[in-house]
UniProtKB/Swiss-Prot annotation:
InterPro entries assigned to the protein according to its UniProt record, in alphabetical order: UPF0145_dom_sf (IPR035439), UPF0145_YbjQ-like (IPR002765)
HAMAP family named among the record's database cross-references: UPF0145 (MF_00338)
Top-rank taxon, per record: Archaea
Family: Belongs to the UPF0145 family.
Family matches, as Pfam families: YbjQ_1
Phylogenetic placement of the source organism: Archaea, Methanobacteriati, Methanobacteriota, Thermococci, Thermococcales
Organism: Pyrococcus horikoshii (strain ATCC 700860 / DSM 12428 / JCM 9974 / NBRC 100139 / OT-3)
Membrane-spanning residues: none
The protein, known as: UPF0145 protein PH1682
Amino acid sequence: MKDMKTIEGIIVVTTPEIPGYKVVEVKGVARGGTVRATHIGRDIMALLRNLKGGEVKEYTEMMAEAREEALRRMALHAKELGANAVVNFRFATSNLGGSMAEIYAYGTAVVVERVEK
């Protein structure tokens, strides 16, 4: 697996298969999530940006960090399940009210082996 990008040592792909590998065991659903809330400083900056239009960089950065954390937690959960890969990886988001949002990463934790050519 040295030629593939991994997260916490786990191959993570959005596809049902990994080229050059075969699934030999399904371990279950791997998942990881995080809830993020804004703070008054970000809210003020966002309000000012909203007045003139355009991207709200403070929120974009916060959500990017949240996605990376959810992805890392999902990979760690897959490792706990005994997997070395996650296939069919997806993100989900939900608004928890006010200025809080949940980012959830999930996929199928599997054990894969390299296919000999």
